[in-house]
Amino acid sequence: MRVPSTGRGALPRPRLLTRGMAVLLATALGACARSTPHGAATSSASPPPEERVLRVYNWDDYIGFHTVADFERATGIQVVYDLFDSNETLEGKLLVGDSGYDIVSTSENYYGRQIRAGLYEPLNKAELPNWKYLDPQVLAVQARFDPGNRFAAPYLHSMNGFAYNRSLVRARLPDAPVDSLDMLFKPEIVAKFADCGVSFLDSPDDVIQLALAYLHLDPNSRRVEDLAAAEQLLLAVRPYIRVFDSSDYINQLATKELCVAMAWSSDYSIAVVRSRAAGLHLDLAFTVPKEGSDITYNALLIPIGAPHPHAAHQFINFILDPNVIAAITNDIHYGNDNLAAQPLVDPQIRDDPSVYPPPQIRARLYLPTEFDAKYQRLRTRTWTRIKSGI
């Protein structure tokens, strides 16, 4: 087993598609349209036996503490476990082809277009008896991006919002609107926390979507004028933002280097765990803002041409075991959507609204969407101006 670690917090799920990636993706779509369709007949000759190896490509801090070792022990399959730090890195490997990986993890607005580009193998449900434990409602959501749930196996979910240190915030603004995106986007409020540190995610899609939600506009809007309004909002608070960061902010919250941070919900949970491990008892909290936020469902998929497809199915079925996925949730505080696993999740985690949002929070969550390459380039240029404060 080889499981490298950066030692950082759970890395982001950026959604930005660069211009070069867009061109490659368009080329891949065309090429795949001319190649063998999914599910087409293949040679009747029996394939050679697979070597007992599995290559996994995943985010940092996105697996249970003992999951890989337990899988190796249960199956005798050796796991090579590599890490990536952005969806762009993963997508680049998939588009080039012959990645050598058997399992990858990404979110719905990425795998939707990647499925259409023919970058994944269809799942053989006969090899996934634990599929029966999955929440039908979540499968229905994912079917919007993966019709028929043919390619993507639900893994974990998280939300966007902001984390903050209660004591540091109260000391500066006793009546701070901690239920609202005013904490991030209202200049006179954000300025109050500039001295103790405010950070935004280094993810244009997440930041711009939250800005649009704050303006009571469609978070997935493709209107140029809506993007311009979000840009002006963000430029107004730019002087008070210490850093744009999607990984180190977890540690900085735990060590009081930041007092307010745009965050993914489960990263906040990791920050709490790390602060306790360091002997720090921080008064941290997380808010899914009343104006709305996104929820992201990550999945496990098998890249086209994976060298060990049977081992990949064994791994997915292992992850879908209620005991296994519950242990993952208990370790890293990401919610899972396995119905049979819920009674096995630590009650403190199961009752945490930042991990399992109750109906009143779910009502204000939205799914991210896909953008065409032209609009994505416009967002990229806008993001560059925002970060530079121009």
Regions found by a protein language model. Name each.
Residues 110-113, 260-281:
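A ligand-binding cleft/hinge motif common to bilobed small-molecule-binding domains
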Residues 121-132, 182, 278-294, 303-305:
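Short beta-strand->loop
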Residues 1-53:
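Short, low-complexity disordered leader/linker segments with a strong preference
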Residues 298, 303-364:
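Mature extracytoplasmic/periplasmic domains
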Residues 227-236, 242, 280-301, 350:
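Periplasmic-binding protein-like
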Residues 32-35, 40-114:
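Early extracytoplasmic/lumenal segment of secretory-pathway proteins
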Residues 105-240, 245-254, 271:
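Extracytoplasmic ligand-binding site segments that recognize negatively charged/polar headgroups
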Residues 251, 359-390:
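Conserved C-terminal helix/tail region of periplasmic/extracytoplasmic solute-binding proteins
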